[in-house]
Curated annotation (Swiss-Prot):
Propeptide cleavage-removed residue intervals: 19-77
The protein, known as: U9-barytoxin-Tl1a
Highest taxon in the source lineage: Eukaryota
Signal peptide residue numbers: 1-18
Biological source species: Trittame loki
Domain notes: The presence of a 'disulfide through disulfide knot' structurally defines this protein as a knottin.
Amino acid sequence: MNTMITFLVLFVLTAANGAPEANERKIPEAIHNEDQSLAEMAEELMFFLQQTEFEAPLLQEEEEAEXAEXRNSRERRCAMGDVPCTKGKTNCCKGYECKPKSPAWWYDTDFCQSIHSGRPIGI
């Protein structure tokens, strides 16, 4: 344990005091290279921003067209069996039609009923 602590202290002292002249020479070159790379990155960023400003309205128009297609192609909600409906405005699903439930007077509205017996075709 004492050996490890000794080597650790020696390493810290060497790193702190070792060859400061070599590090001082490299710093200005690194700063100069960073300045050049930052300038190049700034130019590339400006070019990219100009491209995106040009393409943004085109992409927005495409998204609006896709949203309009999806909105128009969406299937409307429909009513299945034994759901009240009106004769003039049918909201019954495919395979159902708006018919009176029975000839009884207490059913004042019509209901969606299956055209065929069993499960309707197409659903």
